[in-house]
Amino acid sequence: MNAVNESAATTAEMPVPFVFTDAAADKVKQLIDEEGNPDLKLRVFVQGGGCSGFQYGFTFDEEVNEDDTVMDKNGVQLLIDSMSYQYLVGAEIDYKDDLNGAQFVIKNPNATTTCGCGSSFSV
């Protein structure tokens, strides 16, 4: 398990491999509170599929796997497995609530193309 504390990492020390915004962490905290299970963590993953080749997935998980990278933010843990990590380095995981609806959004600098809905990408 690799632990990343976003608030403690600086560019001079170790660059933060991805950004987990306050808005995303706060929404995850709200959802965990609604579930009534404080052991839940948000798992973000990449899998094959979608119209561009890869797609993002989000799920709650109680277990931290040996190959997971863990980021703590505002009392919430974000998990990314080692396979997905390589596709998400430098990405920003955010939560948006606007005219297009409410959803988690990933801004991924590694994606060379994305589909119109933003849920799939290619590298």
From Swiss-Prot:
Signal peptide interval: none
A Pfam family that the UniProt record links to this protein: Fe-S_biosyn
GO biological-process terms attached to the record: iron-sulfur cluster assembly
Keyword hit for Metal-binding: yes
Residues reported to bind iron-sulfur cluster: C51, C115, C117
GO MF annotations in UniProt: 2 iron, 2 sulfur cluster binding; 4 iron, 4 sulfur cluster binding; iron ion binding
Annotated protein name in UniProt: Putative iron-sulfur cluster insertion protein ErpA 1
Record-annotated disulphide pairs: none
Cofactor: iron-sulfur cluster
InterPro entries tied to this protein: FeS_biogenesis, FeS_cluster_insertion, FeS_cluster_insertion_CS, FeS_cluster_insertion_RrpA, HesB-like_dom_sf
Key word Iron present: yes
Source domain of life: Bacteria
Annotated organism of origin: Burkholderia vietnamiensis (strain G4 / LMG 22486)
Key words, A-Z: Iron, Iron-sulfur, Metal-binding
Family membership noted in the UniProt record: Belongs to the HesB/IscA family.
Function: Required for insertion of 4Fe-4S clusters.
